[in-house]
């Protein structure tokens, strides 16, 4: 039994509530209270609550075991350390511990810190795609912004190979997992993870064949396995460059008939494949428009550029986009799936309401169109087009456009905050749609042979007067160490290139900070961390 605690109830009231809730049950084996997500008790209070609840539950269920989850409320930075101190007391009431989302420490740190008499059970997040414990491509966090914006946090998400990797990375620390779900969007992953728990060496392709035999009878199990693996492949790289999207969609169309459209699992796969193709086709079309419009802008033909950017989608795209609602209607009838708020009663657009997010911008078409209408000026618009261009001996990096392959994997458990699904009006350029949130950042840059430079960072505003050591070093030498951000703020740049809630901060970097044109740049802040979406090193002019 999973449950959460709140400070609104006393220990006695909480125990009474849970005992009454469990009273009709013929048995209760394990009680699994979450420390946070949700929950708002301090760690020591959480342990006292756990002990009281177990004491009362044992009156009805003498053999019930207590497995508290080390999920930390965000308001207590020291919650994790306090949890470890409580566990160091070797409490007899506790039989094991759970490791789940919103954890205050890594799984390795948890296992090292807690006596081996307490087994750890994993509570993996199989549901979510972004802003979560295991984001798409969690080992590199490079899910393309076009998908992250349009499919969002709870889209249909079979990721068999990736969750096999999750299982391999965690299984040596844990005694198993607690399979859970918040819907049917993660239907395939539940079977994959449960099968891996049963046999860590199982062939996941055979798991998918079994899935097909059980739930999609009459189809070639190999084809269904190929489709599911293909949906995972669809999410690799830029959708405009990924032909897997077309292949998977066409394969599903070849299997489609009236009878199979009554099978919700088939419709689930078809809906996801159709969404992927909508994103790919729209992105290809719009990138072509942007290229054509850019040519006109550079020639000063502003009105011609406007007409190009306003061009309608082709009929084939309109028909494809129009096919989504009938599929969503069918899924709602068959399984109660809620793919939008208005028609199907979804809680909010982030909770799997793909129909509400599928039309969010996937290119800078709308952004450029807005800029063109606001400033129909050749020079201004050329600057917008060249926003991210730098010289050969300069450097520009965007988390959204470039990913960690360019700068290397970061230390610790950073948080990648995707903000593109808020960009419904196209006011934000795509290069700003991913915001890195952590206490440290490190990257190596070379080829900086132009003398003195300027470092320009686009920070997300999060004012904190307590910060006194926002620190930037180049090759180990301190460039800045002081209150939050430091440097000098460039309001003109912000007005022209950024959106509200972001700051452009510039730091002077004299040539002595470079070693033969190379720089090992490190940013640290130990209290609240920092958030930024992009940076550039340009020659001082």
Language-model regions, residue ranges each:
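Catalytic-core regions of glycoside hydrolase
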Residues: 2-219, 314-329, 333
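Generic structural signal for short, solvent-exposed loop/turn connectors between secondary structure elements
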Residues: 3-20, 34, 38-48, 102-109, ...
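Surface-exposed beta-strand edges and their flanking turn/coil or helix-capping segments
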Residues: 46, 81, 111-112, 133-137, ...
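Poly-acidic low-complexity segments
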Residues: 146-151, 157-159, 203, 241, ...
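Generic detector of ordered secondary-structure context
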Residues: 169-174, 203, 223, 435, ...
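C-terminal non-catalytic alpha-helical accessory regions
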Residues: 181-189, 201-388
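Extracytoplasmic
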Residues: 368-541
């Amino acid at each position: 039994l999973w449950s959460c605690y709140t400070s609104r109830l006393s220990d006695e009231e909480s125990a009474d509530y849970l005992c009454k809730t469990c009273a009709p049950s013929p048995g209760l084996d394990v009680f699994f209270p979450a420390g946070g997500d949700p929950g708002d008790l301090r760690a020591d209070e959480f342990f006292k609550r756990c002990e009281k609840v177990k004491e009362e539950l044992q009156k009805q269920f003498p053999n019930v075991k207590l497995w508290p989850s080390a999920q930390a409320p965000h308001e207590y930075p020291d919650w994790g350390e306090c949890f470890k101190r409580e566990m160091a007391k070797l409490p007899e009431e506790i039989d094991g511990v759970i490791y789940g989302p919103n954890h205050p420490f890594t799984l390795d740190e948890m296992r090292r810190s807690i006596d081996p008499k307490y087994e750890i059970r994993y509570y993996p997040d199989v549901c979510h795609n972004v802003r979560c414990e295991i984001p798409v491509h969690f080992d590199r966090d490079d899910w393309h912004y076009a998908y992250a914006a349009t499919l969002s946090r709870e889209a249909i998400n079979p990721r068999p190979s990736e969750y096999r990797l999750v299982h391999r990375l965690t299984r040596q620390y844990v005694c198993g997992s607690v399979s859970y779900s918040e819907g049917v969007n993660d239907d395939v992953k539940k079977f994959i993870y449960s099968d891996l728990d049963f046999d860590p060496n199982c062939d996941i392709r055979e798991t998918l064949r079994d899935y097909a035999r059980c739930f999609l009878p009459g189809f070639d199990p190999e084809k269904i396995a190929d489709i599911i693996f293909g949906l995972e492949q669809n999410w690799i790289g830029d959708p405009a460059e990924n032909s897997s999207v077309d292949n998977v969609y066409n394969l599903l169309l070849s299997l489609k008939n009236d009878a199979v459209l009554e099978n919700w699992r088939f419709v689930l796969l078809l809906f996801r494949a159709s969404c992927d193709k909508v994103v790919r086709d729209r992105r290809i079309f719009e990138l072509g428009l942007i290229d054509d419009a850019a040519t006109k802008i550079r020639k000063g033909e502003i009105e011609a550029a406007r007409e190009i950017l306003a061009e309608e989608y082709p009929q084939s795209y309109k028909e494809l986009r129009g096919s989504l609602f009938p599929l969503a209607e069918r899924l709602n009838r068959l399984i109660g799936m809620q793919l939008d708020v208005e028609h199907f009663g979804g809680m909010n657009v982030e909770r799997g309401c793909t129909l509400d997010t599928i039309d969010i911008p996937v290119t800078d078409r709308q952004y450029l169109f807005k800029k063109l209408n606001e400033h129909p000026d050749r020079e201004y618009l050329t600057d917008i087009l060249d926003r991210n261009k730098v010289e050969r001996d300069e450097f520009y990096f965007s988390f959204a456009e470039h990913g960690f392959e360019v700068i290397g994997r970061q230390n610790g458990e950073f948080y990648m905050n995707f903000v593109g699904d808020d960009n419904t009006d196209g006011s934000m350029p795509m290069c700003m749609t991913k915001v890195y949130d952590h206490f440290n950042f490190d990257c190596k840059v070379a080829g900086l042979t132009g003398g003195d430079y300027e470092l320009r960072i686009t920070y997300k505003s999060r004012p904190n007067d307590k910060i006194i050591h926002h620190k930037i070093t180049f090759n180990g030498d301190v460039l800045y160490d002081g209150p939050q951000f430091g440097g000098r703020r460039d309001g003109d740049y912000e007005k022209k290139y950024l959106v509200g809630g972001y700051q452009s901060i510039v730091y002077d970097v004299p040539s002595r900070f470079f070693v033969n044109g190379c720089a090992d740049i490190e940013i640290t802040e130990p209290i609240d961390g920092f958030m930024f979406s992009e940076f550039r090193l340009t020659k001082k002019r």
